[in-house]
């Protein structure tokens, strides 16, 4: 279904009106009770600007006059229509000796009586119902009791109803001073009345159905509290008027000085409280104290706690199935890979030609390698080491005496077999 446009428009007008009133209150805050001409002129200008914007006051007055004229024209039209189409009312007649005030005016019923209080007939529309014959099946007191609700009662009326309703039953009950909670709840919630029945047993309820002396309803308490309360604007105006004319004017410098003074007073107060609590703690008077204050008052407890700590070390036991992993693990440090300049003093560098002078892998060189290596590969024999490296002079190598009968054919065969067996085992 489409939304109701009229309802929305009406709601928006009310909301706009409330917003305008709120803006006016904010802009004229504290100026309501001022009687000066300038203040009143300012309030009037602000109100006009918020309500009518930038319109000229003459235009506003003219529009209001036009609205009044339209209303008057509508009233005249309604009066003319009523005169043209009004129903014809016959002259009202009553019997001899009857009181005219006991008869309702027929013209008043149609809304056409122009005599007002001078009319000899009654203008009370409830008079007809009062003059009706009573029905034997209806008790008028029931209607009166139904209309007589607790909303219209005062304390005296409430006590009277309670005494009439529960007076005799209270006399028969055992003596107790406890008031029934259902009774109190019904009174507080405005549910009590002539036809109220106690949920705790009706008239057989063992508790009292009477108000204790000096009892005050909650709604009456709230009214008294509301009467004592005053609005924030009135409180500010009252306090301002109580200050008098000889006061210091608030400026930025005075406000900052006041704020600094208040802050220093707060710090001094905290220090005094801390000193007092510290003295109470030393004297054993402070029963409730925080952990932070304990360490502030006695900082040596921090070191004592470290000394009393348990230094027991626990070693993890290794089972029979576990493998002892002795491999060390080092973290990667990026700084190790940064290139740096290294001093070359005391460092020997191999020659580039060492690969070209390397002896070929032939049977001729195996014997020399086994006996100590060739000098061409940069290796030194045991004799060179013993002689201090003096065997090589001017690129020539001294001949080493070799005993040809040292290794016979049988010895070489045994050596080859041992070498073959070693290769297989590896």
UniProtKB/Swiss-Prot annotation:
Q: Where are the zinc fingers (C3H1-type)?
A: 99-126, 174-212
Question: What is the first-listed, main subcellular location in coarse terms?
Answer: cytoplasm
Q: Supply the SMART domains for this chain.
A: ZnF_C3H1
Q: Which segments of the protein form a coiled coil according to its record?
A: 61-86, 218-285
Record-level GO BP terms? cytokine-mediated signaling pathway
What keywords is this UniProt entry annotated with?
Answer: Coiled coil, Cytoplasm, Metal-binding, Nucleus, Phosphoprotein, Repeat, Zinc, Zinc-finger
**Location of Phosphoserine modifications:** 231, 351, 381
Cell location: Cytoplasm; Nucleus
The induction field says:
By erythropoietin.
Polar residues compositional bias: what residue ranges?
Answer: 53-62
What family, per the record? Belongs to the ZC3H15/TMA46 family.
Q: What is this protein called?
A: Zinc finger CCCH domain-containing protein 15
Species of the source? Mus musculus (Mouse)
- The encoding gene is Zc3h15
